Amino acid sequence: MKNIEKFEQLFNQFLQCVTTLQEALNVSFAEALTETFDNLENNKIKVEMGAPDEETVAKLGEMYKKLNYDELPRQTKIQVFSYLALKAVNDDGRDVNQMPTPPVLATVIALIMQKLLPDKELDILDPAIGTGNLLYSVINQLKDRNHSKNLYRLYGIDNDEDMLNLADVAAHLNDLDIELYCQDAILPWMVPSPDAVVSDLPIGYYPLDENVKDFATKSDKGHSFAHLLFIEQIIKNLKPGGFGFLLVPKSILSGKVGADFMPWLTKKVYLKSIIELPDSMFQNKFNQKSILVFQNHGGSAASSEVFLTKLDSLKSEEALVNFNVKLNEWYTKTIH
């Protein structure tokens, strides 16, 4: 059987386990997914107040046996879980902002982080962590390039408990430790000030005007843009000299919004890089994103020439190699 067919078969077996539990407990797909992986990791089916019933427990026990879960490679478990988490966002009618970030963007961000971050223990946070796939993918790539040394203490914030539970399972599957906080990230953070923030920022309007009356990026009329508020909150909370590696709407970097926002941003931080992503990655021009990299004032931070580039494609290995060559040239000339 071809690898892809094998994986499809395995995915469908996992899917059946999740939907069986979902029906028995009458919960969302995300909740059933979290509990399924908890059951498999702990090798025990959790029963609370008689649910799931004995018949379902027996049925799940047989289904779990057929998975041979303990024999599966870690990477396969992560892959299956990632696809099921994507289904959870779709099926539960969740916000489009909770859709996982394409893995190739984690590679681009990891390449930049490797150049800019100091080689020491660092606190790294995603204040809109969702299922955790962007942060974990970035950290795994940094670890791989660092001879498996894990120099990072990880933190995540989200206001959706179901997403945090999925992020918790994903961290466990990736063999990463993380502290997760359920809160509105526009309110004061409960986490320590991070050395770096990595995030695919939520896009849209923030509905609670009262919470943002002291924000410089708030709107004069009506609701404010959540993505601008997030950037301001990140800058407020980063350590002096700390870095932001953010996926942001392309529209905030130019046009009417950019005309107001960019002068404010460049007074607050040192811009390091703006990377325009391929148009083909997005359904329409309103969804287009760029990678924004900046360094907070303070510490040994200093201004430097900004690394500006557009990625025309990310479909080939060659595109990433070319990007890395340009990045190295900029780093050698400007930073190093």
Give the location of each predicted region.
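Conserved nucleotide-binding/hydrolysis micro-motifs of P-loop NTPases
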Residues: 202-204, 251-253, 281, 297-299
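Mobile active-site "lid"/loop adjacent to the S-adenosyl-L-methionine
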Residues: 200-230, 251
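C-terminal regulatory/effector modules of DNA-binding transcriptional regulators
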Residues: 212, 238-241, 292
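Conserved Class I SAM-dependent methyltransferase catalytic core
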Residues: 223-280, 287
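Flexible, glycine-/basic-rich loop-and-beta segments that form/coincide
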Residues: 286-336
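Short acidic, glycine/Ser/Thr-rich loop/turn "cap" segments at secondary-structure junctions
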Residues: 87-98, 122
